Design a protein with these regions (language model features):
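Short coil/turn segments that connect the beta-strands within blades of beta-propeller domains
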Residues: 71-73, 120-121, 363-364, 418-419, ...
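Surface-exposed loop/edge segments in extracytoplasmic proteins
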Residues: 90-97, 168-173
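N-terminal beta-propeller domains
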Residues: 1-92, 265-358, 362-410, 472-492
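Elongated alpha-helical scaffolds
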Residues: 111-132, 421-424, 430-431
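Beta-sheet-dominated scaffold domains
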Residues: 373, 402-494
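Repeated scaffold domains used in trafficking and secretory/extracellular systems
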Residues: 57-69, 103-118, 355-358, 409-413, ...
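Long, charge-dense tracts
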Residues: 105, 113-115, 122, 128, ...
């Protein structure tokens, strides 16, 4: 067979598996250390630049690049419980202070077990196998207190206060005089009336309760308000009546129908739940009197005995760049619950009890995504997943959303591409849409994006602002696809 020699201007089509007679002149059987260029033809592949050498064995580590500028780049490498940071320009190890070895523990290859997102000097590191839990700290139990207060006083009026323990009523009464004498005006002032009942409780009612074996009660007066404290664990009720349709003398223990049923003066730390309909199953919120008797106010707080926050040991951790070649690692500080009862209001984030599969920053919020849900932090605060109030839904409140879109497909990875937060699973990709509105609970919905086969082995990678790359296995081969977006919607691929 005759060997022929000829010049080819380019081999830009690369290696071809077609027969020699079928393939074009810009293809070949094999190349070694070559780079195909349309203008320059086949040139030698660019060589590597030696920086440093290490004696370190890795199987399939997790690698994350932190690029602070053209001349300051770092590689974070994790495998097992070992974390190291290398300066890409010098090849030298950086100083890492702190230890998060417990959070790094994982099974299987590290590459698939971790994800990292860097914003500014801070890298948020996610262990995709760690199940999130609530912390052990609970809000304080409510003291065994009751409150009675006067809103007004009237002439020739009978006022009654009843403390009921089991089936026994302990009753004290006071009747004001008529208005026949000018001096009688003193006897209808609210502070005077409260003082009369305080004296009666201390001299008559509380001794009777103690004699019956129910323990010691105390009472404190704050202006026209009486705060009664009973023994811890004792179940008792309190109610009042008056001759003005029960509008002058009011009492409550731990629940009221509205803030108008609360006194303007109380003692610091008194807690009450507000149920606007008065029904037992109504959605409540909780208030606490904070401050002095004459200067304090009612402030929304967490219900008694409720978990205050997330267990930081199970949440994403922080790798912070504190200076050139200097890093610290630690758990993050997550915001605590400020209001609600964790059951009907300010409920636990849906990722509690599950591993977080992916994280992304979007619109000033940190999104934590599980297999079926996405939880976005409070606006402009990536570390808060509880609302500021249980009374209303603020535009800045966290968002907890079911992103399954009616499918059983698990979410493997997420990516922000085309200006949208996308959720990627096999044969189903969706995205978070708010139209032209800012991201908030009442404007958020999940829309279908595409139906690509996707094995989840590698997360999709955004390319610029309008496209992304993703790969998936096709039999023994792998396929790389670039998807283009317009207005966040897939418009084509190569």
């Amino acid at each position: 067979m005759t060997v022929s020699t000829q010049t080819h201007s380019s081999l830009v089509q690369g290696i071809s598996q077609q027969s020699a007679i079928s393939r074009g002149t810009a293809s070949c059987d094999d190349e070694v250390n070559c780079f195909n260029d349309v203008l320059e033809g086949v040139v030698s592949r660019m060589g590597s630049v030696w920086k440093a050498s290490y004696v370190q064995g890795y199987n399939d580590p997790f690698v994350h690049e932190v690029e602070r500028g053209a001349y300051e780049k770092y590689l974070i490498i994790i495998e097992g419980t070992n974390l190291r940071v290398i300066n890409k320009d010098t090849g030298q190890d950086c100083t890492v202070t702190g230890s998060i070895a417990a959070y790094l523990a994982h099974s299987g290859n590290a590459r698939g077990c971790f994800q990292a997102v860097t914003i500014g000097d801070t890298t948020h590191l996610l262990n995709r196998q760690r199940v999130v839990a609530m912390g052990s700290a609970l809000s304080p139990d409510r003291p065994n207190k009751a409150c009675a207060f006067f809103k007004a006083g009237g002439y020739k009026m009978k006022y009654r206060l009843v403390i009921r323990i089991a089936s026994t009523d302990y009753i004290t009464e006071f009747e004001t005089p008529d208005n026949s004498a000018a001096g009688n005006a003193e006897f209808i002032t609210t502070d005077y009336l409260a003082n009369e009942f305080q004296d009666s409780l201390n001299t008559t009612i509380f001794p009777a309760i103690a004699t019956d074996g129910h323990g010691t009660f105390t009472v404190v007066q704050a202006g026209s308000t009486l705060i009664i404290t009973g023994p811890a664990g004792l179940n008792y009720d309190i109610h009042t009546t008056d001759g003005a349709g029960d509008t002058h003398f009011l009492a409550f223990k731990d629940t009221v129908k509205g803030i108008t049923s609360l006194p303007s003066k109380c003692v610091n730390g008194y807690q009450v739940s507000v149920r606007t309909t008065g029904e037992a199953d109504a959605t409540p919120y909780y208030l606490e009197y904070q401050g002095g008797a004459g200067t304090g106010s009612w402030v929304e707080v967490v219900a008694p005995g409720v978990a205050l926050g997330l267990d930081a040991a199970t949440m994403p951790h922080i790798i912070r760049n504190t200076g050139p070649d200097t890093f610290t690692v630690s758990p993050a500080t997550w915001g605590q619950r400020l209001a609600g009862d964790g059951d009907k209001t300010a409920v636990d984030p849906s990722f509690v009890g599950q591993p977080i599969k992916s994280m992304q920053f979007l619109g000033g919020r940190l999104a934590c995504i599980t297999e079926y849900t996405a939880v976005l932090s409070r606006a402009r605060n990536a570390y808060v997943y509880f609302p500021d109030t249980a009374q209303t839904e603020l535009a800045t409140a966290p968002i907890d959303y079911d992103v399954s879109n009616g499918s059983s497909t698990l979410i493997e990875h997420t990516v922000v591409a085309g200006g949208k937060l996308q959720f990627w699973g096999n044969k189903q990709q969706t995205y978070l849409d708010t139209g032209q509105e800012a991201i908030k609970a009442d404007t958020t919905e999940v829309m279908p994006l595409a139906n690509y086969e996707y094995d989840g082995e590698c997360p999709p990678k955004a390319i610029g602002l309008s496209s992304l790359l993703f790969g998936t296995a096709i039999g023994p081969w792998a396929q790389i696809t670039e998807v283009f977006f317009r207005g966040g919607i897939a418009q084509g691929e190569i």
